[in-house]
């Protein structure tokens, strides 16, 4: 008896995956739905945080827009490097056909932002007018944490949409299941139900194995957490600036822990739980820092504290009419 492709090594074989190419340019250049969905996730996240900066925090959204040109290449490179680190042997530059690990993209994006925003926000044109306790108009430099609170949670939008790209590619499926266990999926989302099948040939018969829609679970949890963070935590006045962005790392770690046990064996690797633990720890420590330690440090970012070591003169707030060099002041605003 001949047995072929019973257990998928990386992707499923079904009708959904067979149509993963959206269109072709010429005869050799294919554009995949994965890439289109990936770009849509980026654009939706950009639109969301730009509106947030403009209407909620009332600070210039230009720095966030210009950050796109740094974030996109850094995120893609970081995601690809991370994918290689966990064992993806595809061609490094084959971005259109999957092979992007979101953890690497997040790390690369956050590190680049930690360098970019403290530098660009020192430019006087991005400073904002505010009132001091006496009603005098002063100039303040927006905090990097404002942009972090606006931008970092929108990563969840990209992650939620990106999982649907994985679905069309036949990737990120859960453990083996049965048709009876997934009757709810067949009724609610017939196309997804069909997309979770893996067809194989046994002798002269075509059979299939069906898997849990892990991508759907992660996508759903990402949306729920985003709504909770962006439209719940953001409006709790007792929470300090930066808490919202740090909560992303905590909750994303929780999501990964909760879905890891349902992951198919070929998508698990030794460092998974270590990485998830680091996400949780970083989120908790970061939240504690911005909520309790940062106020003691007068809400000044670490880079500013280091710079101040070289300046003995104490910074003072000036009335707007007396202000000459707004870039020299390290004040922050958070509305």
Swiss-Prot record:
Main location: membrane
Keywords: Cell membrane, Membrane, Transferase, Transmembrane, Transmembrane helix
Topology of the protein relative to the lipid bilayer: Multi-pass membrane protein
Transmembrane regions: 31-51, 67-87, 100-120, 213-233, 235-255, 277-297
Listed GO biological process terms: lipoprotein biosynthetic process
Pathway the protein acts in: Protein modification; lipoprotein biosynthesis (diacylglyceryl transfer)
GO cellular component labels: plasma membrane
Binding site for a 1,2-diacyl-sn-glycero-3-phospho-(1'-sn-glycerol): 163
E.C. code: 2.5.1.145
Single GO MF descriptor: phosphatidylglycerol-prolipoprotein diacylglyceryl transferase activity
Subcellular location: Cell membrane
HAMAP family according to UniProt: Lgt
Cross-referenced NCBIfam families: lgt (TIGR00544)
Chain's role: Catalyzes the transfer of the diacylglyceryl group from phosphatidylglycerol to the sulfhydryl group of the N-terminal cysteine of a prolipoprotein, the first step in the formation of mature lipoproteins.
Protein family according to the UniProt entry: Belongs to the Lgt family.
Protein name per the record: Phosphatidylglycerol--prolipoprotein diacylglyceryl transferase
């Amino acid at each position: 008896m001949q047995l072929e492709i019973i257990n998928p090594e990386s992707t499923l074989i079904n009708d959904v995956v067979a149509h993963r190419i959206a269109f072709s340019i010429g005869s050799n250049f294919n554009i995949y739905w994965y890439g289109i969905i990936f770009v849509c996730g980026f654009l939706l996240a950009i639109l969301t945080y730009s509106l947030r900066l403009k209407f909620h925090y009332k600070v210039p959204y230009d720095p966030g827009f210009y950050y796109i040109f740094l974030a996109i290449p850094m995120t893609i490179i970081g995601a690809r490097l991370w994918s290689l680190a966990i064992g993806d042997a595809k061609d490094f530059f084959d971005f259109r056909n999957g092979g992007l690990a979101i953890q690497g993209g997040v790390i690369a994006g956050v590190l680049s932002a930690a360098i970019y925003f403290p530098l660009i926000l020192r430019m006087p044109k991005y400073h904002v007018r505010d009132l001091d306790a006496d009603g005098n108009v002063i100039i303040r430099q927006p905090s990097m944490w404002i942009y972090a609170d606006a931008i970092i949670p929108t990563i969840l939008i990209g992650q939620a949409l990106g999982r649907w790209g994985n679905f069309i590619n036949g990737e990120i499926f859960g453990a083996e299941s049965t048709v009876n266990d997934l009757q709810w999926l067949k009724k609610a989302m017939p196309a997804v139900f069909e997309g979770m099948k893996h067809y194989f040939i046994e002798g002269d018969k075509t059979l299939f194995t069906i898997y849990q829609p892990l991508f759907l679970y992660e996508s759903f949890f990402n949306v729920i957490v985003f709504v909770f963070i962006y439209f719940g935590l953001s409006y709790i006045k007792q929470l300090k600036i930066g808490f919202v962005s740090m909560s992303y790392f905590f909750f994303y770690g929780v999501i990964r822990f909760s879905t890891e046990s349902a992951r198919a064996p070929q998508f698990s690797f030794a460092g998974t739980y270590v990485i998830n633990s680091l996400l949780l720890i970083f989120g908790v420590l970061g939240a504690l820092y911005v909520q309790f330690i940062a106020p003691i440090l007068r809400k000044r970012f670490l880079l500013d504290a280091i710079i101040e070591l070289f300046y003995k003169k104490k910074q003072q707030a000036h009335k707007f009419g007396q202000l000459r060099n707004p870039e020299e002041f390290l004040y922050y605003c958070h509305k």
